[in-house]
């Protein structure tokens, strides 16, 4: 019998509910499916006996408290665990998870009956790390949703375990499940005071051992290119092709500083959205860099290119809206490494080697840390996230739940 008897069942139930976020929405949460899912989590938390369960109208988060069972917890830090409920911008309708029991670490895993989508060790060598594991995969038509419903299931199962085992001493624990992490707005209205933790963790990482406290600095740039459309037969010296302006802008950026050509601490510009006509074109970029100075230089370059093009054109035909999204939380956490050190100790106590390296992305913890609550990121188990080749090991999910409990125990000492 599994240590956390409802962990996998809970996860499978969660992923079958669509909770895709929508960056074009103006509501919080951005989709009604997230609203309903979070209401369901609130009821589940109440059913487990957690207290002060409430959903914030401002942020969409559900917060809950597991009271301390210590005789004296005056010197025990209140710890929080946070995960997001939304899934990335990929088909998440009618998720049909499949379980591959006792994977041999070598065989191809056919996702769909036709064999159009296959997990292979040649393309995904990390599969070799999972010999003997039970893997949950997709059926090839959707993502899985382990990012981050594995984290939700792990936190929920840890709380359930603590309630069933009152002999485990712990201080006060806070739980937060929120929306819209995938579109970068989830933590914008996170209320640190209402949450009430001294330190916190997002459970939103990948493979076993991941412990992250360094993220990108991040910004988004939306550009509008204004053209002039006339008949092609009389276009000479009159037509201004907005599509060509967008191409010229893109070609002015460093060709090798893109996601597919960078790694580690190397930053990039990423053009991920384009639409347009001769009359008007629109592009959207994300700008990423771990180094704040380089980050600011990247943003300035984008502004400078727009200004130069407008000067050459003799009028404003390139309009740029540049907005910061989040910052590298290392700036906050390196001032007080308590949360990181405790997570490292917890993993080592469990025989897990902490894998610490800069995240080529961000978490809700990036924003929450800058709000005054240090929030590094713990592994949740997912691999190949955001697409049809996503999978997760049930054994790694169990280990992630173990780490949550070990952190709680260490803080209670």
Swiss-Prot record:
UniProt name for this protein: Peptidase T
Domain of life: Bacteria
Reactions it catalyzes: Release of the N-terminal residue from a tripeptide
Gene, per the UniProt record: pepT
Names of the cofactor(s): Zn(2+)
Keyword Iron: no
Location (main, coarse): cytoplasm
Compartments (UniProt record): Cytoplasm
Originating organism: Ligilactobacillus salivarius (strain UCC118)
């Amino acid at each position: 019998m599994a240590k956390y008897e409802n962990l996998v069942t809970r996860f499978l139930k969660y992923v079958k509910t669509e909770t895709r976020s929508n960056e074009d929405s103006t509501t919080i949460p951005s989709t009604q499916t997230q609203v309903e899912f979070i209401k369901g989590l609130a009821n589940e938390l109440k059913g487990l006996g957690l207290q002060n369960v409430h959903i914030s109208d401002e942020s969409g988060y559900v917060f809950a408290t597991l009271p301390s069972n210590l005789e004296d917890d005056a010197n025990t830090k209140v710890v929080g665990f946070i995960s997001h409920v939304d899934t990335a911008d990929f088909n998440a309708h009618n998720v049909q998870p499949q379980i591959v029991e006792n994977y041999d670490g070598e065989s191809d895993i056919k996702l769909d009956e036709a064999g159009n989508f296959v997990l292979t060790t040649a393309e995904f060598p990390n599969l070799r790390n999972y010999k003997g594991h039970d893997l949950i995969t997709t059926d090839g038509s959707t993502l899985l949703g382990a990012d981050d419903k594995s984290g939700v299931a792990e936190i929920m199962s840890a709380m359930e375990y603590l309630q069933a085992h009152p002999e485990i001493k712990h201080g006060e624990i806070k739980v937060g499940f929120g929306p819209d992490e995938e579109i970068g707005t989830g933590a914008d209205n996170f209320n640190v005071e209402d949450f009430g933790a001294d330190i916190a963790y997002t459970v939103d990482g990948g493979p076993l051992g991941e412990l992250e406290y360094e993220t990108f600095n991040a910004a988004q740039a939306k550009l509008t290119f204004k053209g002039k459309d006339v008949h092609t037969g009389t276009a000479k010296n009159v037509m201004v092709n907005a599509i060509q302006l967008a191409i010229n802008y893109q070609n002015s950026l460093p060709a090798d500083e893109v996601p597919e050509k960078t790694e580690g601490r190397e930053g990039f510009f990423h053009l991920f959205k384009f639409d347009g006509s001769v009359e008007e074109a629109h592009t959207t970029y994300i700008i990423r860099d771990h180094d704040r100075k380089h980050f600011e230089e990247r943003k300035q370059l984008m502004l400078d290119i727009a200004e130069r093009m407008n000067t050459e054109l003799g009028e404003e035909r390139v309009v740029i809206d540049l907005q910061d999204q989040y910052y590298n939380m290392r700036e906050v956490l390196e001032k007080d490494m308590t949360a990181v050190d405790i997570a490292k100790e917890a993993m080592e106590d469990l025989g897990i080697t902490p894998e610490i390296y800069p995240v080529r992305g961000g978490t809700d913890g990036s924003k929450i840390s800058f709000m005054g609550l240090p929030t590094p990121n713990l592994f949740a188990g997912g691999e190949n996230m955001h697409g049809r080749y996503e999978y997760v090991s049930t054994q790694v999910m169990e280990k992630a739940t173990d780490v949550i409990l070990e952190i709680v125990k260490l803080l209670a000492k």
